[in-house]
Swiss-Prot record:
It comes from Chlamydia felis (strain Fe/C-56). NCBIfam families: rpmH_bact. GO terms for molecular function: structural constituent of ribosome. It comes from the Bacteria. The gene is rpmH. The keyword Cell inner membrane does not apply. Residues 1-14, 31-45 have a biased composition (Basic residues). PROSITE patterns: RIBOSOMAL_L34. This is Large ribosomal subunit protein bL34. GO terms for biological process: translation. Belongs to the bacterial ribosomal protein bL34 family. GO terms for cellular component: ribonucleoprotein complex; ribosome.
Length: 45
């Protein structure tokens, strides 16, 4: 049986990377929320 998590750096960047977050309004909201909170890393890759 194939496992559910098949890691790929490219897929991960495309779905949860900085540019993916900037592409949608909700993603930008998420980044601003993390900035307000004082996160050292905005994107947790």
């Amino acid at each position: 049986m194939k496992r559910t998590y098949q890691p790929s750096k490219r897929k991960r960047r495309n779905s949860v990377g900085f540019r993916a977050r900037m592409a949608t309004k909700s993603g930008r909201n998420l980044l601003n929320r993390r900035r307000r909170h004082g996160r050292h890393n905005l994107i947790d890759l």
